[in-house]
Regions:
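C-terminal amphipathic/interface module of NAD(P)-dependent oxidoreductases
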Residues: 274-303
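Catalytic helix-loop patch of NAD(P)-dependent Rossmann-fold dehydrogenases
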Residues: 82-90, 124-171, 192-195
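Mid/C-terminal beta-alpha module of Rossmann-like enzyme folds, strongest
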Residues: 216, 220-274
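Conserved Rossmann-fold NAD(P)-dependent oxidoreductase catalytic core, especially the SDR/UDP-sugar
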Residues: 97-140, 156
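Substrate-positioning beta->alpha
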Residues: 98, 176-182, 195-219, 225-229
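N-terminal Rossmann NAD(P)H-binding glycine-rich loop of SDR-like oxidoreductase domains
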Residues: 2-21
Length: 303
């Protein structure tokens, strides 16, 4: 049996739907909501309440052979929490370690932790990120994920459980939340955007590609105790992404040429330097390891 935490989230819903044909699947959710109604009837849903280092996982984890841990505190731009790092650590680090401990106690064979490409960093300089790069988390969210990775690795070395860590690039797909949703709204509401000269290289991963990789990691023997970066093979620029989103929404957004350096300066003056980095800098990911080691075959591009 496979336990998927956060099964009513964007990734979780797609994952449990994909897995149900080949595995017995159970999912945990904080509370029953409208999103749970969209889950397949064959998938058992267990309510755990808020995720913390005191969560009772007994019912959810009972009989599980594999745990795929998706649930966590998401990376939200303009987070207004007084101490975001503490909140991220409570959910993404401490609660994850607690779940891992429960997995060990219950004889789980493999624990798959969905981390973030942010662990590697938020900018590449002519060379794509690989699994061999030294981590350089540049946000509180990424730091909390990296701290979880380190502690999971230490704990796994002292147990018989197999650990797999996945660091996805920004995930896109139908009804994707977060930054993709923001950019999509901008692309559909603004007939003209100043991205005509933006030629950066950004890696993304489709929800379908990420789900197929997670499914491979459930059973593939070579995945044991490995870290994999998850991304589509071909990066796109912000200009290309806006054009794609505009096409999907059947609008006609025009990207006109405007100096990128001036947009960076304006963003910095407005306190939006991080947003400018997301729009204009490179963040390229090399997916070679997963393709070669696991035989993963991601469909490419925003097809």
């Amino acid at each position: 049996m496979v336990l998927v935490t956060g099964g009513n989230g964007f990734i979780g819903k797609e994952l449990v739907t994909f897995l149900q044909n080949d595995f017995t699947v159970r999912t945990s959710v904080r509370q029953l909501d409208g999103k749970c109604k969209a889950l397949p009837p064959s998938v058992e849903t267990v309510v755990t309440g808020d995720i913390s280092d005191k969560t009772n996982w007994n019912r959810a984890i009972d009989g599980a052979d594999v745990v795929i841990h998706l649930a966590g505190r998401a990376h939200i731009l303009d987070d207004t929490a007084l101490s975001p790092i503490d909140l991220f650590r409570e959910v993404n680090t401490k609660a994850t370690l607690h779940l891992f401990d429960e997995a060990v106690k219950n004889g789980v064979r493999r624990f798959i932790f969905v981390s973030s490409i942010g662990v590697n960093g938020n900018i590449t300089h002519g060379k794509p990120f690989t699994e061999q790069d030294s981590p350089e988390p540049a946000s509180d969210y990424a730091l909390s994920k990296y701290e979880a990775e380190k502690q999971l690795t230490l704990a796994a070395a002292q147990s018989d459980i197999e650990l797999v860590i996945i660091r996805p690039a920004l995930v896109y797909g139908k009804n994707a939340p977060g930054n993709i949703a923001r950019l999509s709204r901008i692309a559909t509401r603004c007939p003209f955007l100043p991205f005509g000269l933006v030629a950066n290289r950004k890696s993304f991963v489709s929800i379908e590609n990420l789900v197929s990789l997670l499914a491979l990691c459930i059973t593939h023997p070579a995945a044991s105790n490995q870290v994999f970066l998850a991304a589509d093979t071909t990066p796109v620029s912000t200009k290309q992404l806006v054009n794609i989103l505009s096409k999907v929404e059947e609008t006609n957004t025009i990207n006109f040429p405007f100096p990128v350096v001036l947009m960076r300066m304006a963003a910095t003056l407005l306190g939006k330097k991080a947003m400018a980095s997301q729009l204009f800098d490179d963040l390229e990911v090399d997916n070679t390891k997963a393709r070669k080691m696991l035989g993963w075959k991601p469909c490419d591009g925003f097809d």
